[in-house]
Each structure stands twice: as C-alpha cells, then as structure tokens.
C-alpha cells in the first residue's frame, strides 16, 4: 500500500497549472500527486518519473495521450525529457524520501520493524546495498555517513563498533544491525536512533542528496520562465538544499553576482514554506515531518 499523498492540495496548487501545459511528477510512487495534476489538465501532458519497479505497476491505468511514465531516477530528468521530445516544462513536483509501500515491504530492508536483508535499494537494478556499506566501508566512511546523513551523535563510536563486529561475522540483516545498535542507543530513544542510522544508510545507498542536487540544477534548465517548482521534503538535509538553491541559486554560500553587482538567482520563492496543519498530521503520520517549498523560475 502506498501512502496517502502529503500536502496534496497545496503542492498541486503551487504549480499554478495551465490546462494546456506540460508538467512533471518526479516521484510517481502511488500516483496520488499525478492523479491530482491530471484532473487539472485538458490538452496538457504529464510526465512522471520513478526508479522503483513496484511504483511502475501503479501507472498502468493512467497510460494514455496525456500521461507518460518514465522508469528512471529523477536525477536524469533533462536527458529523459529530451528523449521524449520535451525541451521545456511548465511545472515540476517532487515528493521526496521513502514511500510507505517501501517501508511496509519487509524484504526491501527499509524498516526497523522487520527482520530482513539489509537492502534499502529504491532501484533494485543497482548493485550497492546497505549490507555492502556496513561490511565494506572504512571506519572513516561509516563515521562520515552516520554523522552527515543520520546526524547520529555518537557516529564515531558506532562506526568503530560496526567495524569490530563485522570482523567476527558480516552484518547482513536488519535484526543483526539493530542488535549492535542497541548497545549505543540513548535509553528511551532507541527507535529514533535506529531510524537515524537507517536513514543514513538509505541516503548513501540511493545517493539521495546527490540526486536531489542534480534535479534542482537541471530544473532551472527544463522549466520555462514563470514555471513552478513544488518540492516536499522530509528532513532538514533535503529541505536545506531546496531552500538554499531557491534563495541563493546554489547549495552553499551566498548568491553569485555578475560584473554589475546584480544577483544571479534562477528562482524566486512563492510564499513561505508550508507545513501540514494539525489535522493532516493527525490523519497522516508521514506528514509530520513534511515541508513544502514552492518557487518560480525567473
């Protein structure tokens, strides 16, 4: 089962849809956002991306003249739009992160709730799994990803423990990993700690932040002037990248200026960041950490 779409009304309204326009849903998933966009189109066209083969099955009832599913990672958006004869689009929507379906499918290895292989690949055609990271990365490498992507406070100590443990026996299952983590998790906050470690591994396996950077950089090339960008993120690492790119035109530092001192920013923010209201958070657990940012191409 796929999750109830988060911030559905707000994210689609943020696109300011032209019924004859061309739009892209870069994270098709269960198709909730795509179906809502299609309701607003008449002569327009929607292209949707998803790298997960399970999600592709959800699109079968939508395939038609106004909808095309592209089974690929959104980091290649420019390439695949060109292959479909599309140069510029009117809007782009992204609902980042992991889907409820992926979490609730035990054998995918995304959840702390099930004993399963340490997989965590969104695209199961790629080779690297979470088990490969745990068992093959150096202590320094593990320390880095646990600290950067999971914001794990005792990342160095945990990295040392994982390296020591895998000498005796490879850590190949979620239960084996959690057994190691249990000795280092803050008392009373075990689930949060496990989730932080799993998040770090998932981001590394799928190169999520690098893919997001690629998407944002290419969005300024594929969006028409006046085109809208509507992005929902679920943790501070994602949101910071989106915020900085929209406000400064780059991921770090201040906006660049030309020879005349004019700021070079490809986007302007449309309103403030939007968080789900209390009712949606109560109704949809996944919405609790969501944040929507809308921007317009200059």
From Swiss-Prot:
The segment annotated Disordered runs over 255-298
In which compartments does the protein localize?
Cytoplasm
One matching Pfam family: Methyltransf_5
Alphabetized UniProt keyword annotations: Cytoplasm, Methyltransferase, rRNA processing, S-adenosyl-L-methionine, Transferase
Which InterPro entries would you find in this protein's record? RsmH, SAM-dep_MeTrfase_MraW_recog, SAM-dependent_MTases_sf
| Enzyme Commission identifier(s) | 2.1.1.199
Q: Which HAMAP family match?
A: 16SrRNA_methyltr_H
The record's PANTHER family line, in alphabetical order, gives:
12S RRNA N4-METHYLCYTIDINE METHYLTRANSFERASE, S-ADENOSYL-METHYLTRANSFERASE MRAW
Described by its record, this protein's role is as follows: Specifically methylates the N4 position of cytidine in position 1402 (C1402) of 16S rRNA.
Protein name, per record:
Ribosomal RNA small subunit methyltransferase H
User: Which organism is this entry from?
Assistant: Cytophaga hutchinsonii (strain ATCC 33406 / DSM 1761 / CIP 103989 / NBRC 15051 / NCIMB 9469 / D465)
- Gene encoding the protein: rsmH
